[in-house]
Amino acid sequence: MKFLSDLLPVLLFFAAYSLTGNIYLATGVAIVSTAAQVGISWFKHRKVEPMQWVSLALILVLGGLTLVLHDKRFIMWKPTVLYWLLGAGFLISDLAFRKNPIKAMMGKQIELPERLWAKLTFAWSGFFAFMGALNLFVAFNFSEAVWVNFKLFGGMGLMLVFVLAQGMVLSRYIQEKN
């Protein structure tokens, strides 16, 4: 359920663009829906996840610049900035603070050696770097409509493939241990 909630602003952005072909209207929908998502989270739980704050800040700044300057390039940069912040955050957390973010998220569900946790963190950081670069490539080499479709379907599809590939690697390791 949380996954769908987190995906809602992207789905609404896509729906608004698909219905109108207007990236500025779709950007406004993304801003409002992200702000509403954070507000609802605060109202229901008296807590907002750090990623929701980051998403809200990015959509307010880059979406706001898109609307104020009437320049779609700002909203097209948003996924890249988010991906690169995530990748950098994973690396900084692991290398500078010796706190592996993947282990912090999954450590209670699965037991792995430290070297494998480190590999997972580097794999995710690399994936986020790749996704950020790929977003820019699509945004600035293809039509606006192609980018909007890539933002939802391409990004989600590649994420799913990456997660499944990691699941296969982890399942092989777990089977070896059992």
From Swiss-Prot:
Membrane-spanning parts: 12-32, 50-70, 74-94, 120-140, 145-165
Major location category of this protein: membrane
Membrane is among the record's keywords: yes
Membrane topology, from the record: Multi-pass membrane protein
Keyword DNA damage on entry: no
One GO CC term on file: plasma membrane
Keywords: Cell inner membrane, Cell membrane, Membrane, Transmembrane, Transmembrane helix
Location in the cell: Cell inner membrane
Domain of life: Bacteria
One Pfam family from the record: IspA
InterPro entries the UniProt entry points to: YciB
HAMAP family in the record: YciB
Function of the protein: Plays a role in cell envelope biogenesis, maintenance of cell envelope integrity and membrane homeostasis.
Family affiliation: Belongs to the YciB family.
Protein name, as recorded: Inner membrane-spanning protein YciB
